[in-house]
């Protein structure tokens, strides 16, 4: 995943690669989207912002159909693997992500064959994501087999980067005696791109005619890992509260279900806009009073929603609709930037929304704290410095071994 893809992993990998290209020779092997965001065909090879990019053969079948998604994963991973066997050299540091899920395994083989060091960034922990989203049955042979494979993977790589404490625990259990290779490095907030905007000046709220409403927003992926059903159940219970509007912005497997429910239940307090381009983030993330960020209970440790950091940058309080043990909920509670509610209890969410609406002064204080975190603890400078230290560790270790 890499530019011009706009998904979170592609964005973060692009920014990291371009940063390290200032100090090292950086090359990227990735899938090949047909067009960029402006409809311009994407070249197979290019040198962009200091990075050599080679886009491999890819399949673009509908990823919402599971069989097609598997085919896409296989084609993309095989293509990158074959290129990696040629492009990777002895002594290289290779950085790989967990999407698609097969990619880390084929990259590990390529690195072992070519004598390179491998750094694994975990965005999603498998097979836990598959179990939580209902793709695999817990306790099934396939789940146990995938757990075994991932244990081998985690013990074969030289560093593991995880996005939160819950993920570190889960990955640590699989890494076993190699758990000392794990480093917690969260995603960053784009505080220079996303910044607070007065509600009455927000163009999206003006366009929708809801500047005078208390707006509860959920932006991002509307997929199997999100407790969208709980959010809709809460919205239905608040249907008679005419001053509260729910604004959904995003895409994913549950979009058709959402549209159907809005029609069937006449949920006039819900506005669904679909996906918006990343460059419009500042407008749409500021189009609310409070932001909902959600994960299913089984997703604790299996993923951390990157959207939360730019919600902070927009100075918006968060209602975490997720397990209390998730990184999302831990940050929300520890930093006092919002509320934590159960992803299985719409009544709890209703109560929290009404509490938030009744104390706008507290909302403002939470928003200020969230923005400060985005500018400091979760700034791009702070997070990239963590990657720099981790890479320096690897280089020092390698030099030490050479001198023995």
Give short role names for the model-derived ranges:
Residues 41-46, 195-209:
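A short helix/loop element that forms part of the nucleotide-sugar donor recognition site in Leloir-type
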Residues 226, 277-284, 291-312, 317-330:
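Nucleotide-sugar-dependent
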Residues 239, 243, 249-250, 255-282:
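Nucleotide-activated donor-binding/catalytic signature segment of Leloir-type glycosyltransferases, i.e.
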Residues 85, 102-105, 109-113, 126, ...:
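Membrane-proximal helix-turn-helix segments that form the acceptor-binding/catalytic region
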Residues 213, 348, 355, 362-376, ...:
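A short, well-ordered alpha-helix in the C-terminal region of glycosyltransferases
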Residues 32, 166, 188:
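Carbohydrate-associated surface elements
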Residues 210-226, 232-235, 247:
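Conserved donor-binding/catalytic core segment of Leloir-type glycosyltransferases
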Residues 1-49, 399, 403-404:
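N-terminal subdomain of nucleotide-sugar transferases
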């Amino acid at each position: 995943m890499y530019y011009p893809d706009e998904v979170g992993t592609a964005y973060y990998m692009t920014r990291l690669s371009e940063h390290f290209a200032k100090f090292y020779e950086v090359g990227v092997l990735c899938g090949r989207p047909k067009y960029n965001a402006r409809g311009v065909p994407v070249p197979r090879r290019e040198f962009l912002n200091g990075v050599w990019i080679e886009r491999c053969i890819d399949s673009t079948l509908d990823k919402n159909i599971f069989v097609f998604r598997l085919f896409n994963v296989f084609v993309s991973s095989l293509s990158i693997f074959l290129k990696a066997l040629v492009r990777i050299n002895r002594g290289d540091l290779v950085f790989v992500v967990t999407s698609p899920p097969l990619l880390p395994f084929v990259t590990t083989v390529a690195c072992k064959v070519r004598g390179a060091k491998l750094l694994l960034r975990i965005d999603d922990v498998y097979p836990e994501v598959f179990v939580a989203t209902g793709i695999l049955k817990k306790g099934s042979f396939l789940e146990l087999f995938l757990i075994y494979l991932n244990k081998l993977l985690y013990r074969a790589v030289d560093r593991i980067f995880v996005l939160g404490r819950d993920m570190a625990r889960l990955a640590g259990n699989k890494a076993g005696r190699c758990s000392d290779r794990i480093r917690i490095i969260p995603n960053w907030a784009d505080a220079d791109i996303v910044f607070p905007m007065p509600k009455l000046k927000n163009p999206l709220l003006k366009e929708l005619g809801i500047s005078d409403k208390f707006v509860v927003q959920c932006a991002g992926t509307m997929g199997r890992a999100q407790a969208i059903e709980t959010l809709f159940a809460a919205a239905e219970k608040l249907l008679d509260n005419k001053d509260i509007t729910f604004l959904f912005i995003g895409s994913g497997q549950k979009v058709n279900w959402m549209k159907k429910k809005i029609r069937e239940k006449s949920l006039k307090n819900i506005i669904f806009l679909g996906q918006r381009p990343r460059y419009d983030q500042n407008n749409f993330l500021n189009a609310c009073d409070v932001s909902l960020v959600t994960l299913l209970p089984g997703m604790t440790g299996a993923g951390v929603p990157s959207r939360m950091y730019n919600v902070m940058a927009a100075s918006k309080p968060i209602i975490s609709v997720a397990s209390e043990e998730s990184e999302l909920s831990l940050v929300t509670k520890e930093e006092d930037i919002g509320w934590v509610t159960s992803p299985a209890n719409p009544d709890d969410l209703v109560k929290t929304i009404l509490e938030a609406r009744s104390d706008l002064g507290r909302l403002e204080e939470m928003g200020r704290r969230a923005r400060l975190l985005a500018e400091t603890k979760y700034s791009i400078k702070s997070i990239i410095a963590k990657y720099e230290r981790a890479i320096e560790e690897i280089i020092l270790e390698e030099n030490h071994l050479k001198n023995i």
